[in-house]
A protein has these predicted regions:
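Basic, often amphipathic N-terminal segments
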Residues: 1-67, 87-148, 161-173
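Active-site/acyl-donor-binding loops of N-acyltransferases
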Residues: 155
Length: 173
């Protein structure tokens, strides 16, 4: 079966996190760029038809393009991530898609709260501590990462590698 996901790419973070993601984030090795997940899992690829694509286009158009920054590292139990601020644009996208597709909650409903984030690495505590220190030093000398979100991206993994299906431009800012 071919899963799909909706993401917002964050290319601005790559210079800081790509080396960690390649080693400690399996999704990076499967062709997923630095991103904020809007909704995963989404539909199976065979369920994505013209009507779904049109609906996603309308959802994206209903959310204004937005700027954000990445300056703070945070943790989940076995993950290190960058927290986008403000995170309201990402939350608005997740909420809008979930309202339109209520049978597909974010992360299959595993978590009571969805936290927009850019994953840096998964690992044990010592590994994550080491990466976090290195990342904070690099970001302190390089300045705040400033990003701009202008599109929602539908990706699929029918080949074992995630590939782009369609990009949906966000509304004018």
């Amino acid at each position: 079966m071919a899963d799909t996901a909706l993401i917002c790419r964050v290319p601005e973070a790559e210079r800081y996190i790509s080396r960690y993601r390649e080693r400690y984030d399996p999704s990076a090795r499967r062709n997923v760029p630095a991103h904020v997940t809007v909704l995963y899992p989404f539909l199976q690829l065979h369920e994505v038809d013209a009507g779904v694509l049109a609906q996603l286009g309308q959802i994206a158009d209903g959310v204004r393009r937005f700027d954000f920054s990445l300056s703070e590292t945070r943790r989940f139990p076995v993950s290190l991530y960058l927290w986008p601020q403000p995170d309201t644009g990402f939350s608005a996208l997740t909420d809008a898609v979930w309202r339109a597709f209520p049978d597909h909650p974010p992360f299959a409903g595993k978590f009571p709260t969805v936290v927009p984030h850019v994953t840096v690495a998964h690992g044990d505590e010592p590994t994550l501590c080491e990466i976090e220190v290195e990342l904070r030093i690099a970001m302190a000398s390089g300045g705040v990462v400033r990003g701009h979100c202008s599109e929602l991206v539908l990706i699929e993994n029918s080949s074992g590698r995630w590939e782009e299906v369609r990009c949906f431009p966000l509304g004018a800012s």
